[in-house]
Amino acid sequence: MSAVTVNDDGLVLRLYIQPKASRDSIVGLHGDEVKVAITAPPVDGQANSHLVKFLGKQFRVAKSQVVIEKGELGRHKQIKIINPQQIPPEVAALIN
């Protein structure tokens, strides 16, 4: 499975998360996943909620349209973005 998969209702992203980074950013490809750096620490779900908020801004969707499908407690996650309004260039480059 590739890092980015296009479905009828949106995108599925396989992510590798780097918490406690100096800034929020989509870093690029990391193995077969997209690496995302976020500033929030991995404590009490702070990193997950920060990730959902960050991806919502990047794809211009509501937070409710960013769904963590797998990996709630780990660095490796599968995220679904429902009907993205925009696709960041770092992700667009990975779509086959």
UniProtKB/Swiss-Prot annotation:
It comes from the Bacteria. GO terms for cellular component: cytoplasm. Pfam families: DUF167. Gene3D superfamilies: YggU-like (3.30.1200.10). NCBIfam families: DUF167 family protein, PRK05090.1. Belongs to the UPF0235 family. This is UPF0235 protein YggU. It comes from Escherichia coli O157:H7.
